[in-house]
């Protein structure tokens, strides 16, 4: 008898047994308690059997027990000592482990995201650097090619300038010929002046009229020899005053600049290096195609209007333009 009483007293000292005893006194079933508390029947059964569900936190379990106690009219002060013996042990073991695992999982996820972010950032920086290097290298190669072409053309221009004096010596021959032609004219005119002198000396001579005729005939061809010289000033004036073209292209240079200009026929109007302070006035058949090594060093006027080169100056690139009378300058 004493053993059975001791067992009943121990069972009554547990939280689950105390709640079951109070429920049975009120005549409630586990299903009714579960419906009123909005819990599962299995959860109510675990509470009465003093079992803690593995998927249920200790905080929620304490809340369910308190709600159950209020339902069966058991004071919380009576259940607190019993809950203190059961819940703290489980809370001390489970709660820290759960928070540690969550923190470890979150830290692992954050570390993976951070690694991926750094990888993407490095890839973007690498691609940007490679693109900039290729563009810079291409510009340097193009500028060096232009410089080589310019130096080659300058060397060719120097060779041609050395041959110019040989060509200018040719007009000296016509000058000598003209001097030779003028000599007979002078000699022919000499008898005309001497003829009047001989006439008074030989007044009675019959030959005097015939000599006068001969001298007159000698003076007659002398006039055509001098007449072709008169048109020369007129031809020289025509050469020095050429007619201005409506398609003039004017360029002023504020620094050394490599330049290449060609017209619609493909003829190169200019190709070479222009020095600081120089200017060019070109005319040809539109449209013009321009290639400028240093756009910031040149100012262009086409048909009296300035050409905008600001987009090439900002990017510091070689300017390639097509100038047309009907359209605005295009790259």
Curated annotation (Swiss-Prot):
Name of the featured protein: Cytoskeleton protein RodZ
Annotated localization: Cell inner membrane
TM region(s), chain numbering: 112-132
Organism lineage string: Bacteria, Pseudomonadati, Pseudomonadota, Gammaproteobacteria, Enterobacterales
Family designation: Belongs to the RodZ family.
Any Gene Ontology biological process: regulation of cell shape
UniProt organism field: Klebsiella pneumoniae subsp. pneumoniae (strain ATCC 700721 / MGH 78578)
Pfam families assigned: HTH_25, RodZ_C
Low complexity bias: start-end ranges: 167-202, 216-234
Any one GO molecular function term: DNA binding
Domain remarks in the Swiss-Prot or TrEMBL record: The helix-turn-helix (HTH) motif in the cytoplasmic domain of the N-terminus is involved in the formation of spirals to maintain the rigid rod shape. As this protein is anchored in the cytoplasmic membrane, the HTH motif may contribute to protein-protein interactions to form the RodZ helix, which is localized beneath the cytoplasmic membrane. The C-terminal domain may be critical for determination of the rod shape by probably interacting with enzymes required for synthesis of the peptidoglycan layer, including PBPs in the periplasm.
Membrane topology term: Single-pass type II membrane protein
